[in-house]
């Protein structure tokens, strides 16, 4: 025959503790509860440090904190009425005290008040008064349950017995069945503890990665801007734009928890698992487990939801690192790598550009300079090539002229761009054709500073050309 289930001990049954530690046999249930309590204390200490040491954030509203406090009170009162274990009553009382302190900190923030800004003082005061009214109402609701329950229990019962059939009032039915009321309060506490983990879960949202849409937006933003100086890095602008885009999207669509907050969640989940193990380790009979089902499900549900919050937060942080470029470069998309590689190559080419050969028409400063000069005079740019030891090919003809090798200058490297402008000058008394070769480096000419001189030179060349044409017609 099976062993009869042991009756639940009273709240202050010292014989139970004596039997638990008798003959050097440590009670497993009590030891697991001690470990769970240590984890809870460490988690709440970290939360207090996080609230006071860092800039405060309104992670939890006053109404949510009031619901958590009401849940803890229901858990404690339900364990007391249902004649549960002493460790369950103490655990509920401790969690209720912690929720009360948290609720008071939300109502009257003491730590971190120096971080508040002084802007929009009136709007902040109105919001504070509105929150204070809602918080006082939420505080009065759970605190009124204790005195009402005490008055309800203190009502004396009628000593006279009434014979015959009669109706039983609901109050007398509840007074005679306090264990049923305790189980109901335990069930309410279980659902309330699960619901208190929904706001942190809704706060977490997967961030968008740096995909094709973001790259097109960055490209359009860069193309719409005016041309920048070559000294500024295009890749730096693209990276900065990408980071601003991803950070703005992260602020709108998802928020992460600090590392300390994740550690508190982990300790709380571990404490919940140890607490559930302590309840199960006390007695394994089905009758006892059925009576302790609300508190057992409460601890397991909170632990599972805390682990889910930790997992989702870690996944979101890893995606954020990948989107911001802190992950490996191999994980980046091909479009991102192509954009950044082209920008870096263009920057290196602009920095290492010391000279431009005559055979190459670059599209940088020299091209812009020649384009500006071509509006005023006709230029002929031809490279000077050495045909032999004493023969040089002159620009403008296809023949070579022999010259003294000793009088020729050695070719300079890199070659200097030679601009030959044929200017004919004449006067009214005599006609003399002077072919002058003007040599200068377009890189040394500041067209923007001497625009008037270039216009004057162009007009003079035009007048001389007209005079030469008239004299040729007269001859």
UniProtKB/Swiss-Prot annotation:
It comes from the Eukaryota. One of its GO terms (molecular function) is basic amino acid transmembrane transporter activity. The modification Phosphoserine is found at residue 465. Residues 390-475 are annotated as: Disordered. It is a multi-pass membrane protein. The chain crosses the membrane at residues 30-50, 62-82, 89-109, 136-156, 180-200, 260-280, 295-315. Keywords: Membrane, Phosphoprotein, Transmembrane, Transmembrane helix. It is found in: Membrane. Residues 424-436 have a biased composition (Low complexity). Signal peptide: none annotated. GO terms for cellular component: membrane. Residues 51-61, 110-135, 201-259, 316-475 are cytoplasmic. Residues 1-29, 83-88, 157-179, 281-294 are extracellular. The keyword Ligase does not apply. Residues 464-475 have a biased composition (Basic and acidic residues). InterPro entries: LAAT-1 (IPR051415). Its main location: membrane. PANTHER family: SEVEN TRANSMEMBRANE PROTEIN 1-RELATED, TRANSMEMBRANE PROTEIN 44. This is Transmembrane protein 44. It comes from Homo sapiens. The lineage of its organism: Eukaryota, Metazoa, Chordata, Craniata, Vertebrata.
